[in-house]
From Swiss-Prot:
One of its GO terms (biological process) is steroid biosynthetic process. Pfam families: 3Beta_HSD (PF01073). One of its GO terms (molecular function) is oxidoreductase activity, acting on the CH-OH group of donors, NAD or NADP as acceptor. It comes from the Viruses. It comes from Variola virus (isolate Human/India/Ind3/1967). Belongs to the 3-beta-HSD family. Corresponds to the N-terminal domain of vaccinia virus 3-beta-HSD. Disulfide bonds: none annotated. This is Truncated 3-beta hydroxy-5-ene steroid dehydrogenase homolog.
Length: 61
């Protein structure tokens, strides 16, 4: 099972990367990490997409 985490996944470039991962065959799960909640979360019928709202800078303090 291949799991990818995309930081900034609700922003312009991050959303594009998530869309590319959705279309990839070997991806089972995508974890989208972003500071703010995504107003229009992406949905896929064949991939598991988990949205995690946090600031990664808070994890290293």
């Amino acid at each position: 099972m291949t799991v990818y985490a995309v930081t900034g996944g609700a922003e312009f470039l991050g959303r594009y990367i998530v869309k590319l991962l959705i279309s990839a065959d070997d991806v089972q799960e995508i974890r989208v990490i972003n500071v703010v909640e995504d107003p229009q979360p992406l949905v896929s019928k064949v991939k598991v997409i988990n949205y995690i709202q946090c600031d990664i800078n808070d994890l290293i303090r």
